[in-house]
Amino acid sequence: MNPIVKSFEYGQHTVTLETGVIARQADAAVLASMGDTTVLVTVVGKKEADAGRDFFPLTVNYQEKTYAAGKIPGGFFKREGRPSEDETLIARLIDRPIRPLFPNGFKNEVQVIITVVSVDPQIEPDIISMIGTSAALAISGIPFSGPLGAARVGYIDGEYVLNPSVAQLATSQLNLVVAGTAGAVLMVESEAQALPEEVMLGSVVYGHDQQQVVIKAIAEFKAEAGKPTWDWTAPTQDADLVAQIKELAEAGLGDAYKIQVKQDRYAQVSVVKAATKEALLASNPSIDLREVDNLLGSLEKKVVRGRIIRGEPRIDGREPDMIRALSVLAGVLPRTHGSALFTRGETQALVTCTLGTERDAQKIDSIMGERTNRFMLHYNFPPYSVGETGMVGSPKRREIGHGKLAWRGINAVMPSAAEFPYSVRVVSEITESNGSSSMASVCGTSLALMDAGVPIKTSVAGIAMGLVKEGDDFVVLSDILGDEDHLGDMDFKVAGTRDGITALQMDIKIEGITKEIMDIALQQAYGARVHILNVMDQAIGSHRDDISDHAPRITVIKINPEKIRDVIGKGGAVIRALTEETGTTIELEDDGTVKIASSNGEATKEAIRRIEEITSEVEVGRIYNGKVIRIVDFGAFVNILPGKDGLVHISQISDERVANVSDHLELNQEVAVKVMEVDRQGRVRLSIKEAQTKEAAAAE
């Protein structure tokens, strides 16, 4: 074994790339480290494409092993199971920038597996995973237009920070990941605290500049460890067939793309394509229809893009910066805690908000440690939303990714636990889709939260931008349709408030996207965002003054932390009885905070009364109504508060001489007693006769 190692300084850490020792039967394997966080990246590609395949089968699997953090998995089987949400999101983060770097026409199956084998709790594994993937693909020999660099950018005290630690991210106003080649940004994913457009653009440029050291190092690593590039050539097009298809279909496709209703447009496009195939088969029965489909797709793309570059109206008749018609409704469902229906053109989201207690929060145990998520946002994309049939079940990668993007857009305006002690779950059901459904989810979530009475700081809206670029000519499109996303060069999603950006996601399919183009897109997105916010605010401009009658109401009280054990009781008996008998949910915190949740106000009051009784201190000189719980020869024990008993000595039962306690008192008898003393050991001395004397005096 002859290891080849490349090390370089990157931000606050040393990055090391090593190959030649582990997983030597893979086409490429790189052990990549950043500090103590280490990942093993393997790449395997098939030398031949499967016959009849018309797509590129790239699979990226990212897996976190609990042994990397010195943990044993939970559950019955004590081993890792299905991918977590975090693993799914990081797999998508790696997939998105590498996919456009494989050549057009390359349809060989490629699988990338990233395994986290060691983790430093202060260094997240996503950036080193992207760097390791780039290095492994670079040395594999598989056709790949890399190397690719990656960087995380924070913004702390007005300064950009390269690859901030987990502790630094806690104080950062920005968490942005940018990936790209030496000459182009390909992918951006970020969450921000309503930062201005110029700060966001600056962070993208900063991250791309800083990652040049990674790209240079991987190029040097490839020169030393790279395998010969595969002998692969892109399939050639039949020029005569291209000309035939253009003659048969170009005019028809141009007319079809003037139809503004999506389903009608798709139907007409299908008619044109079917007629073209029929004509071609008539002249050549042995023609390859898969090749015809590919060439029709290329012509379709050329027709749509040409119209936009020439300044003609878009597919649905809009100008480049126009937003589709908006419809905004809040409070559309009677029994949910909050709801909204947001419609933008042919994209629609039905969004609901549900309030719960702290125990309803999501508990996440990952290799980076345990955390609690009080705000959850789930995105569902059923097949009927695009007029199709399909499987319905657990969320797919795309649904998880879109939900997380919408979550990032809203999280910056959510109230703290001290301001609003509820767990919040939002569900966005995409009921119609023609582009930008994740941004419709952002708008619908903002509305549903306000309808539920959640005191978010301000409204949030999202917009998806697109780009068509031919040579030096380009057009930035606002509020793109699904077709414009598919046929364009960029998908640029921006969510934010009037004051700034809260989430930014960008995927670019071509090189040559300049800072100028990104700046134009951000400024155009700002105008669109403000327009949408104005319409949203007409429906509901601020949160409801009160939460829904159907939502649990949480009342917060404070008790002496030393009394927590009294409220819990032996084996949890006291708190269990409290919750069962009052019908409330009670949560205790170590600092003495008690949260009582119930949709019944009287039940909450009863729970508070009983907790106050349990936790109250015995006051010397005060008269209590107690119950006799035990009789002994020298007196009786009386319960005056939950868990608080005292002794009435035989001499304190009556002014008269008492020979037998049972002649004056019986078990479960209610008596008024006065607290005479509480000694250092907490023992309580009571008197019945003193209580009677005091009551008599008060009566006079």
Curated annotation (Swiss-Prot):
Domain KH: 552-611
Ranges of residues in domain S1 motif: 621-689
Binding site for Mg(2+): D485, D491
Subcellular location field: Cytoplasm
GO MF term (any one): RNA binding
Enzyme class: transferase
Essential cofactor(s): Mg(2+)
A biological process from GO: RNA processing
Record carries keyword Electron transport: no
Coarse class of the protein's main subcellular location: cytoplasm
InterPro entries: ExoRNase_PH_dom1, ExoRNase_PH_dom2, ExoRNase_PH_dom2_sf, KH_dom, KH_dom_type_1, KH_dom_type_1_sf, NA-bd_OB-fold, PNPase
Any one of the GO CC terms: cytosol
Reaction(s) the record says it catalyses: RNA(n+1) + phosphate = RNA(n) + a ribonucleoside 5'-diphosphate
Alphabetically ordered keywords of this record: Cytoplasm, Magnesium, Metal-binding, Nucleotidyltransferase, RNA-binding, Transferase
Entry's EC annotation: 2.7.7.8
Family: Belongs to the polyribonucleotide nucleotidyltransferase family.
Subunit-level organization: Component of the RNA degradosome, which is a multiprotein complex involved in RNA processing and mRNA degradation.
Function comment: Involved in mRNA degradation. Catalyzes the phosphorolysis of single-stranded polyribonucleotides processively in the 3'- to 5'-direction.
Entries under PANTHER family matching the protein: POLYRIBONUCLEOTIDE NUCLEOTIDYLTRANSFERASE, POLYRIBONUCLEOTIDE NUCLEOTIDYLTRANSFERASE 1, MITOCHONDRIAL
Annotated protein name in UniProt: Polyribonucleotide nucleotidyltransferase
Encoding gene per record: pnp
